[in-house]
Amino acid sequence: MRIIYFGTPEFSRIILERISPYLNIIAVVTQPDKPKGRGKRIMCSPVKDFAISKGIPVYQPEKLKGNKEFFEIIRSLNPEALVVASYGKIIPEDILNIPPYGGINVHASVLPKYRGAAPIERAIMNCEKETGVSIMKMERGLDTGPVYAIRKIPILPDDNRGTLSIKLAHLGAELLLEVLPLIKDGKLSPVPQEESLATYAPKLSKEEEIIDWNMRGEKIWCQIRALSPEPGAMTFFRGKILKIFKADFEEKIFNEEIINGTIIEQNKKRGIGVKVNNGILWLLELQPEGKKRMSFLEFMNGYRLNIGERFENS
């Protein structure tokens, strides 16, 4: 099967690396190079990096809709299928209709739950116990197409967005390699999604990065994991931004009235203990404004914390 692969971030690169030895990837389409980091250096996507290393032709159109030149390029390549994994742009119907098997998408959720751009982050932030990948036939709607196959995995307590993304990428690659031959041989038909069960996973807003210390402890813990390894969950300490990348939650009932967000313990083994609605959030990895990431021990030593100090919502 002649395949054009559409993808951009590390999630997509892992899938491409896993499937490329077994499939005929004739070209890769990825997002244009963009400035990144503090120095705003122009960087190419992980997918482009890998494709170049393997000698796979790369295309980086600025736009797809109404791009006649790109349409003709895709048509001239004579693909049998487009395989898409976190490309980052909506692929117009006229392009999806070029190959006989259409567009086949790897989506990092158990559809119809968590349609949209941020299924991994949303699943963790909502404290879900499991998630998975879906292989679906693409159509005009956002992740609304019929589904060929689904595979589930548990979300473990130590999973964050980064670790879960890697697991789901490998799972998606395995599932793709199983279903593509069945699709080609006409042995697997996609099943329509149950619309009444659909939920959506839009990108997280800047406001959702800020910790509300009045939320339940589990929710804050899930928020921190959903925002790690980047951009990090945000709070304010001594008038400056502080990002938190790793924490543990311990359920506990307090007899006395303590304001949520208050430092109640400094434990060299467990972390910085912060009072939350229904327990203690143990902070483990932090990044003060303008500084590098550090362990809780480095933070405790550098900032000489006081019991009773508070992390603020703003």
From Swiss-Prot:
Keywords assigned: Protein biosynthesis, Transferase
Pfam family, one: Formyl_trans_C
One BP term from GO: conversion of methionyl-tRNA to N-formyl-methionyl-tRNA
Top enzyme category: transferase
Disulfide bonds: none
Keyword Transferase: yes
Source organism superkingdom: Bacteria
Chain sites annotated for binding (6S)-5,6,7,8-tetrahydrofolate: S109, V110, L111, P112
Catalytic activity: L-methionyl-tRNA(fMet) + (6R)-10-formyltetrahydrofolate = N-formyl-L-methionyl-tRNA(fMet) + (6S)-5,6,7,8-tetrahydrofolate + H(+)
Keyword Protein biosynthesis (UniProt): yes
Its EC number(s): 2.1.2.9
A GO CC term assigned to this protein in UniProt: cytosol
A GO MF term: methionyl-tRNA formyltransferase activity
Matches recorded under InterPro entries: Fmt, Formyl_trans_C, Formyl_transf_N, Formyl_transf_N_sf, Formyl_transferase-like_C_sf, Met-tRNA-FMT_C, Met-tRNA-FMT_N
UniProt record similarity statement: Belongs to the Fmt family.
NCBIfam families documented for this protein: fmt
Cited PANTHER family: METHIONYL-TRNA FORMYLTRANSFERASE, METHIONYL-TRNA FORMYLTRANSFERASE, MITOCHONDRIAL
Function: Attaches a formyl group to the free amino group of methionyl-tRNA(fMet). The formyl group appears to play a dual role in the initiator identity of N-formylmethionyl-tRNA by promoting its recognition by IF2 and preventing the misappropriation of this tRNA by the elongation apparatus.
Name of the protein described by the UniProt record: Methionyl-tRNA formyltransferase
